[in-house]
């Protein structure tokens, strides 16, 4: 509720008003190769970054994030972690473990916990493996482990859902109009959300490397540009840039 809305409520004699609750969101990262970012790496390990990144973004959507310990690649560990997170939250967001490999346990964990699976793939790049399910009537969002894929799928599919849980009527992503500094093409069969920067004059530039593991180009970007499948956007084209910081 904004200050202006509070003033209007007071001026019209409304002492109490119904509001949507801020949802509690549990964040679970899976992967035996992951290490907490507070220690030292062992051979074959990488620091886990998705929980902190996504928790920060969820706070902008009025979520109340709780970060749970990293889960090793085993079905029993995944089931236990998800059960713990669901007991304490209104929704759970996992990262990693949503593909079809031997070490991907999120989908079988949903089944073991008596949940339902709505879908598990989306036609976007980055971010093809994405799980939407329910356990005990609460939503589970299973995001890819690659950081850029996790951010893109969060923005496109999780953020609107979190807002809807609070009764919000405006669920769309904020965009800024701009024009392309250089031509961009998408030769694939999925929508490609390219990391870009948009400056104060509205000039839109790709951040170069677009691999789903490249956090450096993500850190430089302030927006995403949706390029349809098998299409090319010419230099100077008028475009709408999805703002990342929302």
Task: Annotate each PLM feature.
Residues 27-30, 94-95, 123, 143-144:
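Short beta-strand segments
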Residues 55-105, 109-114:
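N-terminal small/polar loop signature for handling phosphorylated ligands or for N-terminal nucleophile
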Residues 12-19, 43-45, 82-83, 120, ...:
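A generic local secondary-structure boundary/capping motif
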Residues 46-51, 71-77, 120-129:
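A general structural motif
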Residues 27, 58, 93, 196, ...:
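Residue-level signal for inorganic ion chemistry
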Residues 1-72, 224, 243-246:
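Short, glycine/charged-enriched hinge/interface segments at domain edges or termini
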Residues 109-246:
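Flexible glycine/proline-rich
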């Amino acid at each position: 509720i904004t200050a202006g809305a509070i003033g209007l409520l007071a001026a019209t004699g409304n002492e109490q008003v119904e509001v949507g609750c801020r949802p509690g969101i549990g964040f679970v990262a899976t992967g035996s190769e992951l290490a907490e970012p507070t220690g030292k790496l062992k051979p074959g390990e990488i620091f886990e970054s998705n929980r902190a990144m996504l928790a920060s973004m969820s706070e902008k959507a009025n979520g109340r994030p709780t970060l749970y310990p990293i889960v090793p690649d085993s079905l029993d560990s995944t089931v236990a972690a998800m059960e713990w997170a669901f007991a304490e939250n209104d929704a759970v967001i996992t990262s990693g473990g949503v593909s079809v490999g031997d070490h991907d346990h999120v989908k079988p964990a949903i089944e073991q916990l008596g949940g339902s699976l709505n879908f598990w793939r989306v036609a976007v790049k980055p971010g093809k493996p994405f799980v939407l399910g329910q356990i005990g009537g609460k939503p589970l969002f299973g995001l890819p482990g690659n950081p850029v894929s996790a951010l893109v799928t969060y923005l496109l599919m999780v953020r609107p859902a979190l807002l809807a849980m609070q009764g919000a009527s405006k669920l769309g992503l904020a965009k800024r109009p701009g024009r392309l500094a250089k031509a961009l093409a998408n030769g694939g069969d999925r929508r490609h959300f390219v990391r870009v920067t948009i400056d104060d004059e509205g000039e839109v530039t790709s951040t170069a490397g677009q691999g789903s593991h490249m956090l450096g180009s993500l850190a430089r970007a302030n927006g995403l540009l949706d390029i349809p499948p098998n299409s090319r956007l010419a230099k100077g084209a008028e475009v709408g840039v999805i703002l990342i910081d929302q």
